[in-house]
Curated annotation (Swiss-Prot):
Source superkingdom: Bacteria
Chain segments carrying region Zinc metallo-hydrolase: 30-210
Homology family: In the N-terminal section; belongs to the zinc metallo-hydrolase group 3 family.
Cofactor comment text: Binds 3 Fe cations per monomer. Binds 1 FMN per monomer.
Domain Flavodoxin-like: 254-393
Listed name of the protein: Anaerobic nitric oxide reductase flavorubredoxin
């Protein structure tokens, strides 16, 4: 069944009420999802994206009921991931010569998934256009690392519809298609959850890319996403939220999460929260036991928070596995402008809290003092936990923006070479992040004073996660 989006544009996608796991099991889609595909019928007929591979046969059957497949003139693939382009093999078996418009990186991804290099690929770049008749064009905009290297958006003139790919979407299933028709609380919760868990690592790319798109001075009457609703009522509201979320976002909120073996660390978490509330009753404090909580809800709360307290019991001298896994995930999400403190209980030997503190610092958090308790905390120990909460509340609520912690030596004191000795600065050609040899990249164990030639080959750009081969000498230093 198709749904009219606007004029000659129809939704021909697939709802998935049952899906509960995405990206393996990394993202819990508790409200299902949809795979949005769009059919445009002008003088030329255009299909934008397909659906998840598990619905390939249904998709092609439904599409055939809408249009003779041989009448499809162009296929646009904004993103090569299987939930977008998964039905290509089934579709191209019917219309093998139909041109597929996508980015150069998408060809590599599509061939990697479908293994059909003979398909009729047409590479497009930012600013390229495709005439579809009736005075209308498609304009392509590359959006690398939002959230794959192959990503792009497609804008349709005349109808002023932006087919935005994953950006501005959400894993949210509803029989109604448009943003003004669905439950608004559910919608915006899922929008923020989607951004926090998927797009946060690329926040530094969001603002310049949105600015670039706005720079085309094109009207936007609708934003047609790849998942969830189509934004037809005040579509720029979600754009404004993205600009807000991309700027080191935080609320007056503290998240506490922990894992525990014998409830001892849970007791500490509760007492710390009590201490925070005593000093600052206005701050929102959320507590999660990771063994019983939705991981993505925890990460969304971390995204919203100004600080996080992480607790773990000690097991075999290390932290609990679920805590270790979640901290590793936070490292990949690259949260910014947030503080952290570790706490936990132990028996005959400790070790977990110290390791946890180190991992949180490696993940980019500004660290406050940690807290340890031996065995089950008694009344005196619980009072120490409450005092720790009071101290945290004062530090995080009243202090200015986080400063460099004492554990990290100031960069100025660690630099022993002059800039001239270290060679040129290098700039990522994709996201424009600059590697300064004088500063190094501590999160990847590249010490200050490391020339680019000595940076390990497995180095990844901290902003877009691409390798050394995309770096060029900074233009201002090139000879």
């Amino acid at each position: 069944m198709s749904i009219l989006v606007k004029n000659n544009i129809h939704w021909v996608g697939q709802r998935d009420w049952e899906v509960r796991d995405f990206h393996g099991t990394e993202y819990k889609t508790l409200r299902g999802s949809s795979y949005n595909s769009y059919l445009i019928r002008e003088e030329k007929n255009v299909l934008i994206d397909t659906v998840d591979h598990k619905f390939s046969r249904e998709f092609v059957q439904n599409l055939r009921s809408e249009i003779d497949l041989a009448d499809i003139d162009y296929i646009i693939i904004n993103h090569a991931e299987e939930d977008h382009a998964g039905a290509l093999t089934e579709l191209m078996a019917q219309i093998p010569d139909t041109p597929i418009y996508c980015t150069a990186n998408a060809i590599d991804s599509i061939n990697g998934h479908h293994h059909h290099p003979e398909w009729n690929f047409k590479v497009v770049k930012t600013g390229d256009t495709l005439d579809i008749g009736n005075g209308k064009q498609l304009i392509f905009v590359e959006t690398p690392m939002l959230h794959w290297p192959d990503s792009m958006m497609t804008y349709m003139t005349g109808d002023a519809v932006l087919f935005s790919n994953d950006a501005f979407g959400q894993h949210y299933c509803d029989e109604r298609l448009f943003n003004d028709e669905v439950d608004q609380t559910e919608l915006f919760e899922q929008c923020q959850r989607y951004y926090a868990n998927i797009l946060t690592p690329f926040s530094r790319l969001v603002t310049p890319k949105i600015t670039e798109i706005l720079g085309f001075n094109l009207p936007v009457d609708m934003i047609a996403t790849s998942h969830g609703v189509v934004w037809r009522d005040n579509p720029t509201q979600i754009v404004e939220l993205y600009l807000k979320w991309a700027t080191d976002y935080q609320e007056d909120r503290i998240t506490i999460f922990y894992d525990t073996m014998s409830n001892n660390t849970r007791m500490m978490a509760d007492a710390i929260a009590q201490g925070i509330n005593e000093v600052d009753p206005n701050v929102a404090v959320k507590i999660f036991n990771v063994a019983r909580s939705d991981k993505n809800e925890i990460l969304t709360n971390v995204f919203r928070s100004k600080g996080v307290l992480v607790g773990t019991s000690t097991m075999n001298n290390v932290m609990m596995p679920k805590i270790a896994g979640l901290v590793e995930e936070m490292t990949g999400l690259r949260f910014r402008n947030k503080r952290a403190s570790a706490f936990g209980s132990h028996g005959w030997s400790g070790g977990a809290v110290d390791r946890l503190s180190t991992r949180l610092q490696d993940a980019g958090f500004e660290m406050s003092l940690s807290l340890k308790a031996k065995w089950r905390p008694d009344l005196d120990a619980l009072e120490l936990c409450r005092q720790h909460g009071r101290d945290i509340a004062r530090q995080w609520a009243l202090a200015p923006l986080p400063e460099t912690t004492q554990q990290i030596a100031p960069v100025e004191e660690t630099i022993t070479c002059t800039a001239a000795d270290l060679g040129p600065k290098m700039q990522c050609s994709v996201c424009q992040w600059i590697y300064d040899p004088a500063l190094g990249e501590p999160l990847q164990d590249v010490a200050p004073g490391t020339p680019w030639n000595d940076v390990p080959d497995n180095f990844l750009c901290p902003e877009c996660s691409l390798g050394k081969d995309v770096f060029d000498v900074l233009a201002t230093e090139a000879k």
